[in-house]
């Protein structure tokens, strides 16, 4: 795991060449076919030589949830072990990592009807309405979630609505379900002490994405697929900002600056 442009894929490839491992992607966007440039998906040549599980598995007509990722990952761990290999998870979707490690077995499936009701409430109220609602229902979880992190706020409210339990309670009560009790887990985190250099790499990569056709890619995906309002790609870094640009909400300069800012968080 590590921040954007920190060299996760390169390190994973080096480890693949040296050890008896299989790579499993931990990325909420790379799992979708066609979402290539904006997700910095490895090229077809790289994927051919260094296969990644959970890359190009889903159509954008589908919504791939955290619960599905955890279920798929647990199955893959068993399959990889059956081949006498070690699974190496690589990616930057921290919610996926945390959910897999801490356990998500007790969390309910998504409720699209309830989510739509929340979005209607948000549209009729101010931008922080959902966060304030979460704060009233689960202060402990609200304190660790950013007020603009709509995805996690909606999920927490959904859990409360479905189970009657707070998300903070669910996480704590699920601590005995973690992978740490079943497997020997080694976590590798890439930490770049030179933040200025890291930010420069992020900026360069975003420039390359735009030159390689990020806007054209997103335009093609939006025209081809009917994306539900809750679809993860609509809130994904690079895709969210490009869609806003295509809708005329921001100009190209703002697209770059907003995507750059989001990538640095």
Report the location of each language-model feature:
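Phosphate/pyrophosphate-binding catalytic cores of soluble transferases and nucleic-acid-acting enzymes
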Residues: 1-264
């Amino acid at each position: 795991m590590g921040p954007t442009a920190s060299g996760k894929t390169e390190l994973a490839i080096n480890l693949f060449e040296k050890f008896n491992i299989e790579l499993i992607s931990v990325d909420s966007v790379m799992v979708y076919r066609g979402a290539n440039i904006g997700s910095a998906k490895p090229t077809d040549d790289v994927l051919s030589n260094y296969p990644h599980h959970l890359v190009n598995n889903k159509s954008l007509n589908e919504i791939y949830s955290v619960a599905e990722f955890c279920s798929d990952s647990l199955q893959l761990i068993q399959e990889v072990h059956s081949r006498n290999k070690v699974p190496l998870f690589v990616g930057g979707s921290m919610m996926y990592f945390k959910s897999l490690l801490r356990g998500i077995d007790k969390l309910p499936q998504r409720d699209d009807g309830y989510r739509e009701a929340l979005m209607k409430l948000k549209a009729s109220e101010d931008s922080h309405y959902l966060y304030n609602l979460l704060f009233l229902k689960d202060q402990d979880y609200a304190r660790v979630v950013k007020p603009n992190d709509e995805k996690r706020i909606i999920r927490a409210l959904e859990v409360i609505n479905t189970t009657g339990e707070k998300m903070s309670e669910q996480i704590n009560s699920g601590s005995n379900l973690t992978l740490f009790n079943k497997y020997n887990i080694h976590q590798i985190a890439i930490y770049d002490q030179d933040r200025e250099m890291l930010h420069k790499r992020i900026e360069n990569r975003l420039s390359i994405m735009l030159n390689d056709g990020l806007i054209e890619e997103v335009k093609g995906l939006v025209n081809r697929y009917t994306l539900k309002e809750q679809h993860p790609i609509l809130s994904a870094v690079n895709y969210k900002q490009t869609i806003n640009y295509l809708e005329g909400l921001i100009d190209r300069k703002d697209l770059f600056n907003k995507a750059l800012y989001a990538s640095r968080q």
